[in-house]
């Protein structure tokens, strides 16, 4: 199983727009991905409600896990996304 630990970089944490971008990217991954904070139970990374329920604020460490072909690359991309301040970036459709 592939695992990545990453610190949430967005100023608002995993809330609203950053969470939506992350959930969309996780849903496009070639393997199922889970996300958790601390010792909490892992939740599906492609579920907006589950991701929001984590209450991950800026600076929170989250753990991403996936298994299967393409898991390493998928987690690399998702970890890079979470580490950025998505609040400071312009929306792609702007």
Language-model features: where?
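C-terminal structural segments of small proteins and small subunits
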Residues: 57-94
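Compact, glycine-rich, soluble single-domain proteins
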Residues: 7-58, 72
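Intrinsic-disorder/low-complexity, polar/charged segments enriched in Ser/Thr/Lys/Arg/Asp/Glu/Gln
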Residues: 1-5, 61
């Amino acid at each position: 199983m592939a695992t990545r630990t990453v610190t949430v970089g967005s100023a608002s944490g995993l809330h609203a727009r950053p969470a939506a971008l992350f959930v969309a990217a996780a849903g496009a991954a070639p393997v199922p991905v889970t996300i958790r904070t601390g010792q909490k139970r892992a939740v599906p990374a492609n579920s907006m409600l589950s991701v929001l329920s984590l209450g991950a604020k800026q600076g929170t460490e989250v753990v991403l896990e996936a298994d299967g072909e393409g898991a390493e690359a998928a987690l690399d991309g998702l970890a890079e996304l979470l580490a950025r301040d998505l609040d400071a970036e312009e929306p792609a459709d702007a």
